[in-house]
Amino acid sequence: MLDNISKSNKYYLLDYCYMICLGKLVIYHSGDTLYYEGMEEWINRFNPTIALLPINGNDPSRKVAGNLNAEEAVKLSKRCNVQVVIPCHYDLFEFNTADVNEFIKAAKKYEQRFCVLELGGKFSSCEI
């Protein structure tokens, strides 16, 4: 997919995440991630417009890489002034999922704009 982006746009693969810059639109896809000190400062260097963040949390009994939980994802988005946060890492595997309704509650609580997509769903930047 990135091969089709014109040379005037940029993408960065940084550790295990992507920052995709398409003109003024900057998409941050964290991949598997846990919160760490200095995370906001690092993310804010790119001024992301949209963030795709995991919400399935960190439960060592699952024996898989841990992630942000719903509230952590929303708070991170808010602190990074992300215009729209899109949750991911839910409803894919029974043993490693989260209730997307907890994310929705947190987003409303912190007044963070969000978009919940169905599996295979689409989001248009025109919605921003």
What do the PLM-derived regions correspond to, one by one?
Residues 34-120:
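Cap/insert and terminal regions of metallo-dependent hydrolase folds
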Residues 1-46, 118-128:
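Core dinuclear metal-dependent hydrolase active-site scaffold
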